[in-house]
C-alpha cells in the first residue's frame, strides 16, 4: 500500500511529507493540501503546504549540492540513476495504487507508467554517458584567413538548478523525463509536483532517495500554487525550467527571465482522414487516440477532419467501437474513468452543450455522473463551435467533414496550438506533403498522435510549447557549451 513498508517514512500521520536535504520533513506552516479522489470526489490524500521560506532553503541546498555533483564522474551519476530505476520498478505497486486513487488512471495503465518511467531513467543514464562523454575539437585554419594557431576544445557543462513541474496526467513519467536528464547532466533538481499526482511523485522521489543520491541534490516541494507557484518559477536560484501542463506555462515563460525553458502546453491534435484511408485502422486509432485515459492526454485525438466521401462509413465504425468501451472505476481497468476534477468535467460539459445548441449530431446520448463522463462522438461539428478549437481534455471527440485536403490542413493550421497531428492515407507521397504543410511539432502517418517512445523528439509549435523533449534533447537543453581555446605561437600542422 501507498505510504507503508519501504515508503512508511514519507508519511506523517495522514499527511505526506516533503523532501529536502536528503530527509522527509513536515512544513513549518502546519497546513496541508487535500488531494481529491476523482472517482469518489472525497479527500484521498494530504500533502504538506510548504512556505516560501522552505522554498528558499531548498534552493540554497540545491545550489550547494550541484557544485559537488558537477564534479561527480559520469559513470557514477549513471550508476545511481540505474539504481533508482531498479528500485522504482521493483516497487511499482504503491505508485500505481496512488495513480489510481489520485488521478483515476486505470490500474493496468498506472503500472505501465511506472515501469516505463524506470526504463526512461535507465535509457537516460546510458544516453547521457554517450552524449556528455564526447567533446569537440576545432582547428582555426578551417575558417578563411586563419592559420592553424588555435585549438578549440568544447564540452557540455551543467546549467545549475533545474525546476521540474510535471502535469497531473503522467505525474511519474513526466517527472522522471525531467529529473533523469537534469541529474545525468550534472544539475540539481527541484520538483514541484501537481496537486493531483503529488503522492505518486513523492513515492517516486523516495526511490531516488533510496538509491543514495547526495543530500540536497533532489528536492520535492508540495503546496498551493497560489502561495509558492510564482515564487518557485521566478526564484533567482533557478537556472532552467521544464514544465508540462496547460496555459499556465505561457505565464511562466513571460516571468522566467533569461533562462532556458522547456514547455509543453497542450494541443488540439488533428486527425486528417483521406478518402483512400484504411477506415478500420482509422477507427481503431480514433478510439485509442481519443478515448484512452478518458482523453486526458496532450496527444489525444482532439478533432477528426474526414473527407465527406468516407465520413458516414467512418463515423459508423467509430460508433460501433465506442459502444464497446467500458465505463467505471479505475480499479476495474475501465476504459473510461472519471476526469480529474469537477471543474474539468464542467468545462467539458460546456463544450458539449455549446455543440448541442449549434446543431452537432450526438452519436451517443450525453451522460455524466459527477466527474465521470461517458464517451461521446460528435458528428457534423462546424468551425463556429467551441469544440472545433478548444481542447476538451476529456472523452469527447468532434468530427468535422471536409471537402478537400487543403480544408483540413487550413483548419489544423488555424489553431493556436501546434503539438501533434496525424494523417491517414495509403499514398505516402500525399502523407509527406500533408505532414510538411501541417504546423505541428510532430505528424504521425497512419497512427494516432503519441508521445514516445521517450527518446523520440517531442515538441510543440505556437502555443503548444517552447523547446524540445525526448531524452537526448532534454540532456542537451539542460547543459550549455563551454569552450577552451589553446593559442599556439606558430602554426602547427600534423605530419607537416
Swiss-Prot record:
One of its GO terms (cellular component) is cytoplasm. Its EC number is 1.2.1.9. The modification N-acetylalanine is found at residue 2. GO terms for molecular function: glyceraldehyde-3-phosphate dehydrogenase (NADP+) (non-phosphorylating) activity. Its main location: cytoplasm. The modification Phosphothreonine is found at residue 4. The active site is at residues 264, 298. It is found in: Cytoplasm. Keywords: Acetylation, Cytoplasm, NADP, Oxidoreductase, Phosphoprotein. NADP(+) binds at residues 192, 195, 230, 391. Substrate binds at residues 116, 169-170, 297-299, 451. NAD(+) binds at residues 245-249. This is NADP-dependent glyceraldehyde-3-phosphate dehydrogenase. It comes from Arabidopsis thaliana (Mouse-ear cress).
Amino acid at each position: 500500500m501507498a505510504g507503508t513498508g519501504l515508503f512508511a517514512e514519507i508519511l506523517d500521520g495522514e499527511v505526506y511529507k516533503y523532501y529536502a536535504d536528503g530527509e522527509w520533513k513536515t512544513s513549518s506552516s502546519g497546513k496541508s493540501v487535500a488531494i481529491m479522489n476523482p472517482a469518489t470526489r472525497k479527500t484521498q490524500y494530504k500533502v504538506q503546504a510548504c512556505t516560501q521560506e522552505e522554498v528558499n532553503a531548498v534552493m540554497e541546498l540545491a545550489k550547494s549540492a550541484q557544485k559537488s555533483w558537477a564534479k561527480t564522474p559520469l559513470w557514477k551519476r549513471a550508476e545511481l540513476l540505474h539504481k533508482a530505476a531498479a528500485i522504482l520498478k521493483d516497487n511499482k505497486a504503491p505508485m500505481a495504487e496512488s495513480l489510481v486513487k489520485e488521478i483515476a488512471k486505470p490500474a493496468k495503465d498506472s503500472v505501465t507508467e511506472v515501469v516505463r518511467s524506470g526504463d526512461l531513467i535507465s535509457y537516460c543514464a546510458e544516453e547521457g554517458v554517450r552524449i556528455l562523454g564526447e567533446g569537440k575539437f576545432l582547428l582555426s585554419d578551417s575558417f578563411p584567413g586563419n592559420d592553424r594557431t588555435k585549438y578549440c576544445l568544447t564540452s557540455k557543462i551543467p546549467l545549475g538548478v533545474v525546476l521540474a513541474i510535471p502535469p497531473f496526467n503522467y505525474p511519474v513519467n513526466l517527472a522522471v523525463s525531467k529529473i533523469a536528464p537534469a541529474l545525468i547532466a550534472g544539475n540539481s533538481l527541484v520538483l514541484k509536483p501537481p496537486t493531483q499526482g503529488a503522492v505518486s511523485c513523492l513515492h517516486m522521489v523516495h526511490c531516488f532517495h533510496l538509491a543514495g543520491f547526495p543530500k540536497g541534490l533532489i528536492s520535492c516541494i508540495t503546496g498551493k500554487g497560489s502561495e509558492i507557484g510564482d515564487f518557485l518559477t521566478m526564484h533567482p536560484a533557478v537556472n532552467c525550467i521544464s514544465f508540462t501542463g496547460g496555459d499556465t506555462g505561457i505565464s511562466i515563460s513571460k516571468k522566467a527571465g533569461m533562462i532556458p525553458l522547456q514547455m509543453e502546453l497542450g494541443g488540439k491534435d488533428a486527425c486528417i482522414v483521406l478518402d483512400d484511408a484504411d477506415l478500420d485502422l482509422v477507427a481503431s486509432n480514433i478510439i485509442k487516440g481519443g478515448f484512452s485515459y478518458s482523453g486526458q492526454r496532450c496527444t489525444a485525438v482532439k478533432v477528426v477532419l474526414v473527407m465527406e466521401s468516407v465520413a458516414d462509413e467512418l463515423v459508423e465504425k467509430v460508433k460501433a467501437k465506442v459502444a464497446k468501451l467500458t465505463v467505471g472505476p479505475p480499479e476495474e481497468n475501465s476504459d473510461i474513468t472519471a476526469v480529474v476534477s469537477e471543474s474539468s468535467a464542467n468545462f467539458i460539459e460546456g463544450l458539449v452543450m455549446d455543440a448541442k445548441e449549434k446543431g452537432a449530431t450526438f452519436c451517443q446520448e450525453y451522460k455524466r455522473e459527477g466527474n465521470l463522463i461517458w464517451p461521446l462522438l460528435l458528428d457534423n461539428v462546424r468551425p463556429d463551435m467551441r469544440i472545433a478549437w478548444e481542447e476538451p481534455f476529456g472523452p469527447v471527440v468532434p468530427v468535422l467533414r471536409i471537402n478537400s485536403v487543403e480544408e483540413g490542413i487550413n483548419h489544423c493550421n488555424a489553431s493556436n496550438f501546434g503539438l501533434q497531428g496525424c494523417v491517414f492515407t495509403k499514398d505516402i507521397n500525399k502523407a509527406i506533403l500533408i505532414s510538411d504543410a501541417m504546423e505541428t511539432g510532430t505528424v504521425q502517418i497512419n497512427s494516432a498522435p503519441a508521445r514516445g517512445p521517450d527518446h523520440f523528439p517531442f515538441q510543440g509549435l505556437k502555443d503548444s510549447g517552447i523547446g524540445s523533449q525526448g531524452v537526448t534533447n532534454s540532456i542537451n537543453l539542460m547543459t550549455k557549451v563551454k569552450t577552451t581555446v589553446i593559442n599556439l605561437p606558430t602554426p602547427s600542422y600534423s605530419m607537416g
